[in-house]
């Protein structure tokens, strides 16, 4: 039986991957009077006088909403909000399993930015954080930006920023292994969608100075009328040499390739034209931009993918549970760049100098020290950057 059939049978058996479990006992009239009426009125009045006490008297301090509009679900595309529910439930299960964060799935039946923003804003007071999931670009950029402006809790689009943090960790360790400095490398990012743009911005914040982005139609250049507004913004801050041409042209002499695009677009021959001992991160799923075996044939010193059946899996589960755990622990009002940078460095540091090798630059997803290390680093960065409230 293949994994698809096994998953279908498991989901039918489970009848959902999450449930609500009471933290209080309701076994007597006294329990009832404390848990509900009349006793519940007292914390209500306290919160009325001081809304911040909602973090003390309710589960808000540990509760995250996982929200989608169903327009970019995994590799399935626009399948609608209800069809995206199994993914949202799965994400909630990962939050609980890895970081003891209580998460709740919400599937919003709208593609209107104003409606989505208003809906999330209105319910945000029930949660300690918002995790946006599987929302198509470029709409996802505006939704996140506007929510950050109107909500006083962290809003985090994991498809963008969780990916970016993990890519940052992979780059730090690949550079550590190959003896390169982040600010001296030449990088190519293939793709210019939500994840690719977020990764590029974050790696620039990390210190990378020389990045060229490539889309289906070729190298991303300022002034190209085929670019959407988000891509135009990236064209202004990348491609310092104002190159034109194809992916094959872009990778010549490059130290690093990051792919968030399409299957089998990079060849071993292209890799052979890159700088000595190049680093190749082919993250398209399930079929990467180049298979690791072919990348190594082309001379790649380090290869990473999004797949669990190859070494160096770049998996968001290394990032988002710990990031939210750290943010919730200090009641952060935002998840900012400093916190994401701290997360990337913490993930990278979970691989010691003794452990680091070409087949092991990323810690394993089930390494228990990862989530705690990330959470502690994120919490400290929140304090240092002024967004922590406790």
Residue ranges and their predicted role:
Residues 74, 79-99, 151, 157, ...:
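Glycine-rich phosphate/diphosphate-binding loop of Rossmann-like nucleotide-binding domains
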Residues 158-159, 178-180, 282-390:
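Adenosine-phosphate binding glycine-rich loop
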Residues 232-301, 307-309:
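Rossmann-like adenosine-cofactor binding region
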Residues 1-155, 375, 380-381, 385-389:
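N-terminal ligand-binding/catalytic initiation module
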Residues 12, 55-60, 96-97, 122-124, ...:
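Solvent-exposed alpha-helices and their adjacent loops that cap or buttress functional pockets
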Residues 69-71, 79, 108-109, 134-137, ...:
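Short, ordered loop/turn segments at secondary-structure junctions
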Residues 105, 131-134, 155-158, 189, ...:
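General beta-strand structural signal in soluble alpha/beta enzymes
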